Amino acid sequence: MMRALWTAASGMTAQQYNVDTIANNLSNVNTTGFKKIRAEFEDLIYQTHNRAGTPATENTLRPLGNQVGHGTKIAATQRIFEQGKMQSTNLLTDVAIEGDGFYKILLPDGTYAYTRDGSFKIDSNRELVTSQGYKVLPNILFPEEYIQNSITISEEGIVSVKIDTSNEPIELGQIEISRFINPAGLSAIGSNLFKETAGSGQEIAGIPGSEGMGRLRQGILEMSNVSIAEEMVTMIVAQRAYEINSKAIQTSDNMLGIANNLKRQ
């Protein structure tokens, strides 16, 4: 009975973590480029009383074993990198990735991060940056006399503008994107950014539209891939599982009470 208490408690703990994950998904339903997270579970250690295949009698073997589990725990949180919905913004510096890939970002400490959020801006230094002011790599520098409504970004990432003294567009550079063998192994650091890890593998940089890379879509943003209906259903299931485990604790407690009262009867 004591084992049942701890087993059910592990179930409640796991489901609480599950609800926390679902709540995070729902809170980011409008976050640009956000990828939903799914909690994965695994069972805990088993206590074996009899193993399958051991002698039952002198001439027979046990066809089945006798094992009692000790509950569950969160094994991992899997980030689902499905394509989010495309939303038109008509802003020339908004660029979505359609397909695989991440934008490479230079952080203030000199390290690199990666993002699917293409809501870019042009800062006071005339450089293409993220909403947080981090440089997009390779660096794109706009000339002083560029015409703001002339910015074009091709599917292959080529950035062009017109200047006051010429009607011909000038190429400023090309946005590259990076992909990973295991993008789910990237480490989220907030602000829609990810860091490379040993689990994700090293970045594979390339030109948009080539070698398995996605293409760029100017004037469009990729929205969150969270489905409110799906998350609400998952939350109801998690809530019921939490409730059932709490009932198991109550039942085990009642059984302990009955056992404790045996001497008094």
Swiss-Prot record:
Location of this chain's protein in the cell: Bacterial flagellum basal body
GO cellular component: bacterial-type flagellum basal body, distal rod
Keyword Ribosomal protein: no
InterPro entries: Flag_bb_rod_N (IPR001444), Flagellar_basal_body_rod_CS (IPR019776), Flagellar_FlgE/F/G (IPR020013), Flg_bb/hook_C_dom (IPR010930), FlgE/F/G-like (IPR037925), FlgG_G_neg (IPR012834), LlgE_F_G-like_D1 (IPR053967)
KW Nucleotidyltransferase (keyword) present: no
Annotated keywords: Bacterial flagellum
UniProt superkingdom: Bacteria
PROSITE patterns, per database record: FLAGELLA_BB_ROD (PS00588)
GO biological process, one term: bacterial-type flagellum-dependent swarming motility
Subunit structure, as described in the record: The basal body constitutes a major portion of the flagellar organelle and consists of four rings (L,P,S, and M) mounted on a central rod. The rod consists of about 26 subunits of FlgG in the distal portion, and FlgB, FlgC and FlgF are thought to build up the proximal portion of the rod with about 6 subunits each.
Annotated family: Belongs to the flagella basal body rod proteins family.
PANTHER family reported for this sequence: FLAGELLAR BASAL-BODY ROD PROTEIN FLGG, FLAGELLAR PROTEIN
Designated name of the protein: Flagellar basal-body rod protein FlgG
Gene source species: Borreliella burgdorferi (strain ATCC 35210 / DSM 4680 / CIP 102532 / B31) (Borrelia burgdorferi)
